[in-house]
Curated annotation (Swiss-Prot):
Organism the protein comes from: Bacteroides fragilis (strain ATCC 25285 / DSM 2151 / CCUG 4856 / JCM 11019 / LMG 10263 / NCTC 9343 / Onslow / VPI 2553 / EN-2)
Keyword Magnesium: no
Pfam families in the cross-refs: HATPase_c_3, HSP90
Function: Molecular chaperone. Has ATPase activity.
Protein name per Swiss-Prot or TrEMBL: Chaperone protein HtpG
SUPFAM superfamilies per the UniProt record, alphabetical: ATPase domain of HSP90 chaperone/DNA topoisomerase II/histidine kinase, Ribosomal protein S5 domain 2-like
Region annotation (C) ranges: 546-681
Gene that this polypeptide is encoded by: htpG
PANTHER family per UniProt: HEAT SHOCK PROTEIN 90 FAMILY MEMBER
Superkingdom of origin: Bacteria
Cellular component aspect of the GO annotation: cytoplasm
Family: Belongs to the heat shock protein 90 family.
Localization: Cytoplasm
Residue ranges, annotated region (Disordered): 601-620
Length: 681
């Protein structure tokens, strides 16, 4: 029996492994099974070039559980005593401390950097045994034993067959790994597609009302997964079946892209466009990354363009440096090439479907839209390609490319400044009246109700030349596309003031909502009262909800305009009745107000250009008194108008109709509206 110390050139490796890799200690199974697969594949390679002439036999790798042990067994090339000394005992571990400090939270980086796959066994074991026999003719089987200290023993033993058994004596604080369900789950996670059969226990069948083991190995992996096959050999059903195996709870995918490239890097895989039902489905950890069919991670940021991390599927590449920091990964030239390649393949596939089967593309547009819009917003190269197949959808459900839509609206939706005006709605039901008003003017209205459409509108205004997007409820229909300079409202100022004061007094109090009342001549057939919302302010608030650094807008109240149509019969009747009821009370106040206004304006003109210290105190006091008097008289007038409006049910009825049209009338206010409607009828 040989005894000795492991050749570690710095501190003892085992406490380091346990300390720094504990958070990821489940990867020990991946590392040990992968090593067994490597040993098996090496034997296959030697046999193929006639350097091994013996029988290959069953090459299945077996994982088995004992009372306190896990054993991983293979029939690969095995090891001689000299090879154990070279590959197990002599660990090139110089500079370890600096590296461990840098990557102390990344088990993959430490294990992969030093080739320490085997030593991951000590993360969960108090003792490890290697019982191995080389494939070489006349080789002597040996047993290596280590209890987690730098000391080991190596002795000759009897072993009938070539290959290696690694026996882990599990630590007391890692007993979870002796549970069949735990090991089964880890094998499924890490080893489902390894290229050599992996057996864990025996298959079970129901017999006499209970499950019993059969003599057949329970092979847990698919050795030739779909992505390793040629696309020409596969049917649509093959791709769908594989998707169901990967994501059993998901709906059928929209379509898929089979990746297969050998130069200038190696990459295979299948990416699926999933059917997204809601924000909940937007999970970025659904692409599985493999290295030579060994599962590595489902965190592919930096490898896959950000907008494509929403996709599902698998990627397999030996050229992606898997065990390094994220910052290094993002600067790696191969990774950049792979990311660019994947983006190009996706855009080419989308372009192909659009060109060859536009009907199918349009049918799936609502599901594809989230991916395509995300890509256009985040990647310039993708925008340049996607603008040829990205679609607008109007409120009638018709689809247009950007170029097609510009052609459609340029004659009727160009304003006086030669801007192309894209009218849109984000809720067909709530904005129905506004949509219909626009369509009656011959305008087309887009439906932009997607999760990213707020951001898309802002981006497209920058990308599309002389183009502006305006929501249909942002103004009255005649002002949505201003084709010539408008004449000012013909209603005189005193009448506008009377109407505005009356209606403003009856507006409901709403939390974080403010109204501005105005009058406009909108024609006899226009609505008597409408509610609009400034495009700019509304858009700023919407952007504040999705973009950091704009919280100022998010905290501001919603600003709405209550627009009174001075041409409408009902508004005219309210005005005439208001003048009749209020004129006697208003007249003396108005006379006094005009006198105050005249004197105040004269004083202000007199003080123009003077420094404050040059204005007599008496004049300052008089102006201050006049300001207070003016406010007082204005309040008296408004109070009279408010008193009238409170008695005229038509005023509140018209306001409530406008609120109802905008889905802003609820609860008690809605109940009062219904009662009032019955009374008025």
């Amino acid at each position: 029996m040989q005894k000795g110390n492991i050749g570690v050139t710095t501190e003892n490796i085992f406490p380091i492994i346990k300390k720094f890799l504990y958070s990821d200690h489940e990867i020990f199974l991946r590392e040990l099974v992968s090593n067994a697969v490597d040993a098996t594949q090496k034997l296959n390679t030697l046999a193929s070039i006639s350097e091994f002439k013996g029988e290959l036999g069953d090459l299945t790798v077996h994982v088995s559980l004992g009372k306190d042990t896990i054993t991983i067994s293979d029939r690969g090339i095995g090891l001689t005593a000299e090879e154990i000394d070279k590959y197990i005992n002599q660990i090139a571990f110089s500079g370890a401390n600096d590296f461990l400090e840098k990557y102390k939270n990344d088990a993959n980086a430490i294990i992969g950097h030093f080739g320490l796959g085997f030593y991951s066994a000590f993360m969960v074991s108090k003792k490890v045994e290697i019982i191995t026999k080389s494939y070489k003719e006349g080789a002597q089987a040996v047993k290596w034993t280590c209890d987690g200290s730098p000391e080991f023993t190596l002795e000759e033993v009897e072993k009938a067959d070539r290959g290696t058994d690694i026996v882990l004596y599990i630590d007391d604080d890692c007993k979870e790994f002796l549970e069949e369900s735990r090991i089964s789950a880890l094998l499924k996670k890490y080893c489902s597609f390894l290229p050599v059969p992996i057996a864990f226990g025996k298959k079970k069948e129901w017999k006499d009302g209970k499950q019993v083991e059969t003599a057949e190995d329970n092979v847990i992996n698919d050795t030739i997964p779909l992505w390793t096959k040629k696309p020409s050999e596969l049917s649509d059903e093959d791709y769908k079946k594989f998707y169901r195996e990967l994501y059993p709870m998901s709906d059928e995918p929209l379509f898929w892209i089979h990746l297969n490239v050998d130069y200038p890097f190696h990459l295979t895989g299948i990416l699926y466009f999933p059917k997204v039902k809601s924000n909940i489905d937007l999970n970025k950890n659904k692409i599985q990354l493999y290295c030579n069919q060994v599962y590595v991670t489902d965190s592919v940021e930096g490898i896959v363009p950000d907008f494509l991390t929403l996709l599902h599927g698998v990627l397999d590449s030996p050229d992606i440096p898997l065990n390094v920091s994220r910052s290094y990964l993002q600067s790696d030239s191969n990774v950049k090439k792979i990311s660019t390649y994947i983006s190009k393949k996706v855009s080419d596939r989308l372009q192909s479907i659009f060109k060859n089967d536009r009907a199918q593309f349009e049918e799936k547009w609502n599901d594809l839209k989230i991916f395509i819009n995300y890509g256009m917003l985040t990647q310039e190269d993708f925008y340049d390609k996607a603008q040829k197949f990205a679609l607008f959808t109007d409120t009638d459900g018709k689809h247009y490319t950007f170029e097609e839509y510009q052609t459609l609206i340029k004659d009727n939706q160009t304003d006086k400044d030669k801007n192309l005006i894209y009218l849109y709605a984000n809720n067909k039901d709530e904005q129905f009246a506004y949509i219909e008003a626009a369509k009656n003017k011959g305008y087309n209205v887009l439906l932009m109700d997607g999760q990213l459409d707020v951001a898309m509108v802002s981006m497209l205004e920058q990308k599309l030349e002389k183009s502006r997007f305006t929501r249909v409820d942002s103004d009255v229909v005649d002002n949505l596309i201003v084709k010539e300079d408008k004449k000012s409202d013909v209603l005189e100022a005193s009448k506008q003031e009377a109407l505005s004061a009356a209606f403003k007094s009856q507006l409901p109090k709403m939390e974080k909502v403010e109204f501005n009342v105005m009058t406009q001549a909108l024609g006899e057939n226009g609505s008597p009262v409408m509610i609009t919302q400034s495009e700019y302010m509304r858009r700023m608030k919407e952007m504040a909800n999705i973009q950091a650094g704009m919280s100022f807008y998010g905290e501001m109240p919603d600003m709405f305009n209550l627009v009174l149509n001075s041409d409408h019969k009902l508004v005219k009747e309210v005005l005439a009745d208001e003048e009749k009821e209020c004129s006697a009370a208003i007249a003396p106040i108005q006379t006094e107000l005009e006198d105050v206004t005249k004197r105040r304006d004269a004083l202000k003109k007199k003080q123009e250009g003077k420094k404050d210290e040059d204005i007599p105190t008496a004049e300052k006091d008089e102006l201050n008194d006049l300001d207070k008097k003016w406010d007082e008289l204005k309040q008296q007038k408004d109070s009279i108008f408010a008193g009238y409006a409170g008695k005229n049910k038509v005023v509140r009825q018209l306001i409530d109709l406008a609120l109802l049209q905008n889905n802003m009338l609820k609860g008690e206010a809605l109940n009062n509206f219904v009662k009032r409607s019955i009374e008025l009828i």
